């Protein structure tokens, strides 16, 4: 495994399943397992598969200036979002050059969560907040699992009432297996999401 400074809660489980863990965004991440890669691909495309995407960075952006600053830091009008709605956006630097992509989740009237990749989105959000009424919290205790594939919603429907009614690019707070979770329908790999 590469030298990672972030640890997935599932790292031991990934190793037990045969992954060597590769660095992604500073976190040891399972890209492959010891089984047949074609079988793993086929399972996700025809049934369902669970992927640990905890390497994505999660940033909570909260305060009276959060909305206007996100409008400035991203390419989307986040004022159109209401709690429970999310949007895919690009992040640009002061010169208008692409620095990261993200999904912005509105979690409350003045509260957002920005989930971004390996670019410099976090730094952009921190710079935008300086001297403004907004708190910025990088959350490395929040882990992402991506359940994808045509049978994904069938599995969740057994455990989360009303999940079939969740619109695309919306999210909800609920419980799954007795634990508090946020479930979002934000996948974009070709099926329901």
Question: Model regions: which residues?
Answer:
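Acidic, low-complexity central loop/insert segments
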Residues: 100-193
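Acidic, proline/glycine-enriched N-terminal capping motif
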Residues: 1-92, 97
């Amino acid at each position: 495994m590469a030298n990672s400074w972030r640890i997935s809660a599932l790292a031991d489980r990934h190793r037990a399943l045969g992954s060597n863990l590769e660095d992604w965004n500073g976190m040891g991440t399972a890209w492959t397992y010891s089984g047949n890669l074609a079988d793993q691909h086929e399972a996700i495309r025809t049934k369902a598969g669970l992927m640990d995407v905890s390497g994505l960075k999660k940033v909570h952006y909260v305060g009276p200036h959060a909305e206007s600053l996100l409008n400035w830091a991203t390419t989307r009008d986040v004022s159109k979002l209401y709690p429970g709605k999310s949007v895919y956006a690009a992040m640009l630097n002061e010169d208008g050059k692409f620095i990261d992509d993200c999904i912005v989740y509105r979690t409350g009237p003045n509260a957002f969560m920005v989930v971004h990749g390996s670019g410099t989105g976090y730094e952009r959000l921190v710079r935008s907040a300086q001297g403004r009424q907004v708190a910025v919290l990088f959350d490395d205790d929040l882990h992402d699992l991506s359940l994808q594939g045509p049978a994904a919603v069938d599995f969740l429907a057994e455990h989360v009432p009303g999940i079939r009614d969740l619109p695309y690019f919306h999210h909800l707070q609920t419980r799954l297996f007795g634990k508090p979770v946020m479930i979002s329908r934000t996948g974009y790999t070709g099926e329901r999401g």
